[in-house]
Amino acid sequence: MGSAPAQIPTSFGHELRACLRCRLVKTYDQFRDAGCENCPFFKMEEDHERIVEVTTPNFNGIISVMDPSRSWAARWLRIGKFAPGCYTLAVSEPLPEEMQHLCQEERVQYVLPKRM
């Protein structure tokens, strides 16, 4: 997972979506064009229906992280090993079970969201 920076959202508002696994925030079009920098195994750029499965427009707050490995906020949010970029503070829905199994197969940690 990444040292290359993730794309910064090109617009703010209703177009934004957050990855349900890593909480990276981008627009639908950005996920369609480049996928998720932290979760390439979801292959969002190849399967556009998957974007709707593994991202959500329902999230709370947003933080920009330039150097996740040195940011106390990134460590607190457990995103210290992810690519620099914009992240949500919390998502309220879990990753679909099928995608949770994919994370297990890829040996990638997935933590269920806390109840809000």
Swiss-Prot record:
Keyword Oxidoreductase part of the UniProt annotation: no
Major location (coarse): nucleus
Signal peptide: none
Record's keyword terms, sorted: Activator, Metal-binding, Nucleus, Repressor, Transcription, Transcription regulation, Zinc, Zinc-finger
InterPro entries xrefs: RPABC4/Spt4, Spt4, Spt4/RpoE2_Znf, Spt4_sf
Renumbered zinc finger spans (C4-type): 19-39
GO CC list: nucleus
Localization of this protein: Nucleus
The keyword Transcription is assigned to this record: yes
Any one GO molecular function term: zinc ion binding
An example Gene Ontology biological process: regulation of DNA-templated transcription
Source organism, top-level taxon: Eukaryota
Family: Belongs to the SPT4 family.
Function as written in the Swiss-Prot or TrEMBL entry: May regulate transcription elongation by RNA polymerase II. May enhance transcriptional pausing at sites proximal to the promoter, which may in turn facilitate the assembly of an elongation competent RNA polymerase II complex.
PANTHER family: SUPPRESSOR OF TY 4, TRANSCRIPTION ELONGATION FACTOR SPT4 HOMOLOG 2
Protein name: Transcription elongation factor SPT4 homolog 2
Organism of provenance: Arabidopsis thaliana
Highest classification ranks of the organism: Eukaryota, Viridiplantae, Streptophyta, Embryophyta, Tracheophyta
